[in-house]
């Protein structure tokens, strides 16, 4: 269980230092600006506070960019109950209440301020250069990632690059992306050429995120930065970018980084696609009809390290209702099966709030393009084939479909020691004991499997896209049991990304950077859904998907609290009544 506890221990170390509250950004900044950090241990403790921001956002996942990216894409609808208007608003590119995502906005800036604290303090310490470089590289990666999410979510976000609490205002909408790319370039240069084995960021994770950020920025802003440019249907990606320090980052530089990641990261594709997902864990696999008897084995069984993971969020058994809710995987909870029905009805998928029903258009498109692709059944549960499944949730389920995303789901297992014969999560059986904080059999706090944000298959597909060759695509297809393709095409690459990475949070920014979002979203109109358990149709709201995308370019509403402070202007498309979601019916 060492892997599961490492970040908690480090975060607790931060909390104990000088009685500093890790949630108080100003105190962290003041402490470090004079004499802290001094030792390697001090620096690692501050860095743990930067990492802890990953889990802080997991406490309220429904307000995060990752959650929005799932529901806003053409692969998922909103879901949730009639009172969960935020979920439906995310899908419809609408808003619900004044500060729908303000918790996320403020949390990410806290993480950025912690990173800034460490970045500013490190040059003045007496640590050896290798230690400084490692800490600096990780801090720059995390700052870049936090800005990546903010800039993807809101567009023109203020840039804070030094610790402090004074008000900062917006610059140019492209400025955040240039800083993101520069931070990631620096992280690649600073981090040692060695694979991390303890869950920390390494050089290769930085190369992978550099590829992702480059592909988004160069594609999305390829036509310019006005609303018309960003919503244009012309795909004309940039080939070079001038960075804030006056240097230039080219497409060839990014290819070099991705090639290095592929060749030297020590990552590899897992032999069987199903083994990536928690439903093949040893406590569940032989009781699930889809997986039993096939030799599947989850790569994270008993806290093992996933050889395909480059960047993930870790969780542990110390989640509680106070400040540590985010130590549990609350994305799993939110994407769990709605309705509180018996675990046997939905086995092996556990309970939750019903976010992100899979859009029928994804299943239809996939079956038409690749009828023999085993990844489809590995990724999506068809409830129409499960006689025990009961539709409607708590008689309130909105935008329910026949399809359920398996990848991020809570997973149960059989347990003869319990009255109903099932543990609410397999983790209760795999990791017995020491559930002293959350308590055992707590369906809201016992999901602790990793949330993988970047995996090696994504890097292979980025390599193919950047180099316009089929090598990476065909390696991914080979694992899926599919025939190789003979020649590279944008259509083949885009399809392969959609199938391989379905329901993993990457599709939304792919649609935006390829300038195909409006057309793709429109396919969700008219698909079959259920409303409170009764057959219904997914109908346009607030003008429809195309109108809302073209009005906003996919950026969310700036929280009104931030607008009132005078630090940001409201984004286009969010000032009229047509942006406010009033409910499904």
What do the PLM-derived regions correspond to, one by one?
Residues 3-4, 16-41, 144, 180, ...:
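Bacterial Sec-dependent N-terminal signal peptides
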Residues 9-16:
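Bacterial N-terminal signal peptides
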Residues 18-22, 108-109, 236-249, 277-337, ...:
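Long, intrinsically disordered, low-complexity segments
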Residues 21-85, 200, 204, 212-401:
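An aromatic- and glycine-enriched ligand-binding surface/loop that stacks and positions planar moieties
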Residues 32, 39-58, 80-154, 164-200, ...:
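Conserved, well-structured interaction surfaces
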Residues 92-93, 308, 357-454, 584:
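Flexible, polar/acidic helix-loop-strand segments at domain edges
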Residues 149-153, 158, 195, 213-225, ...:
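Short coil/turn linking the two alpha-helices of tandem helical-hairpin repeats
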Residues 155, 202, 207-209, 305-307, ...:
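Residues that flank catalytic or metal-binding motifs in active/ligand-binding sites
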């Amino acid at each position: 269980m060492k892997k599961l506890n490492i970040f908690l221990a480090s975060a607790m170390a931060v909390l104990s230092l000088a009685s500093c509250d890790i949630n108080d950004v100003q105190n962290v900044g003041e402490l470090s600006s004079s004499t802290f950090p001094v030792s390697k241990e001090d620096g690692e403790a501050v860095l743990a506070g930067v990492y802890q921001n990953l889990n802080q956002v997991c406490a309220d996942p429904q307000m995060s960019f990752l959650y929005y990216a799932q529901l806003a894409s053409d692969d998922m609808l909103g879901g949730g109950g009639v009172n969960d208007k935020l979920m439906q608003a995310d899908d419809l590119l609408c808003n619900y209440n004044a500060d729908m995502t303000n918790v996320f906005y403020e949390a990410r800036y806290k993480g950025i301020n912690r990173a800034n604290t460490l970045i500013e303090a490190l040059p003045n310490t007496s640590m050896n250069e290798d230690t400084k470089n490692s800490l600096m590289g990780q801090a720059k990666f995390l700052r870049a990632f936090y800005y990546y999410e903010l800039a993807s979510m809101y567009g023109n976000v203020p840039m804070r690059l030094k610790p402090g609490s004074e008000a900062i205002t917006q610059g140019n909408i492209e400025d955040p992306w240039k800083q993101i790319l520069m931070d990631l370039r620096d992280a690649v240069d600073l981090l040692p050429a060695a694979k991390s084995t303890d869950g920390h960021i390494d050089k290769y994770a930085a190369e992978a995120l550099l590829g992702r950020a480059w592909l988004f920025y160069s594609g999305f802003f390829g036509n310019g930065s006005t609303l018309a440019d960003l919503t244009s249907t012309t795909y004309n990606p940039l080939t070079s970018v001038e960075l804030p320090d006056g240097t230039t980052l080219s497409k060839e530089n990014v290819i070099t980084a991705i090639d290095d990641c592929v060749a030297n990261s020590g990552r590899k594709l897992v032999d069987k696609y199903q083994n990536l997902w928690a439903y093949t864990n040893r406590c569940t696999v032989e009781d699930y009809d889809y997986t039993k008897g096939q030799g599947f084995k989850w790569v994270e069984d008993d806290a093992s390290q996933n050889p395909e993971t480059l960047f993930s969020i870790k969780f542990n058994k110390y989640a509680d209702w106070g400040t540590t809710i985010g130590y549990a995987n609350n994305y799993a909870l939110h994407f769990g099966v709605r309705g509180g029905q018996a675990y046997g009805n939905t086995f092996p998928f556990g309970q939750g709030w019903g976010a992100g029903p899979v859009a029928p258009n994804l299943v239809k498109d996939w079956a038409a393009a690749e009828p023999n692709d085993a990844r489809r059944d590995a990724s999506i549960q068809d409830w129409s084939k499960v006689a025990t499944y009961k539709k409607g949730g708590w008689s309130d389920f909105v935008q329910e479909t026949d399809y359920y995303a398996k990848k991020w789901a809570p997973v149960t297992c059989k347990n003869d020691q319990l009255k109903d014969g099932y543990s609410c999560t397999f983790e209760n059986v795999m990791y017995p004991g020491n559930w002293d904080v959350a308590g055992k059999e707590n369906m809201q706090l016992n999901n602790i499997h990793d949330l993988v944000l970047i995996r090696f298959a994504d890097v292979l597909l980025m390599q193919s896209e950047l180099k316009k060759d089929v090598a990476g695509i065909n390696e991914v297809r080979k694992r899926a049991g599919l025939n190789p393709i003979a020649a590279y095409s944008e259509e083949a690459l885009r399809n392969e990304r959609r199938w391989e990475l379905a329901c993993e949070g990457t599709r939304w920014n792919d649609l935006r950077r390829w300038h195909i979002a409006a057309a793709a979203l429109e396919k969700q109109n008219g698909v079959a859904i259920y409303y409170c358990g009764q057959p219904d149709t997914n109908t346009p709201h607030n003008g429809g998907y195309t109108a809302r995308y073209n009005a906003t370019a996919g950026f969310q509403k700036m929280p009104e609290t931030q607008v009132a402070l005078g630090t940001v202007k409201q984004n286009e498309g969010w000032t009229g009544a047509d942006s406010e979601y009033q409910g499904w019916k």
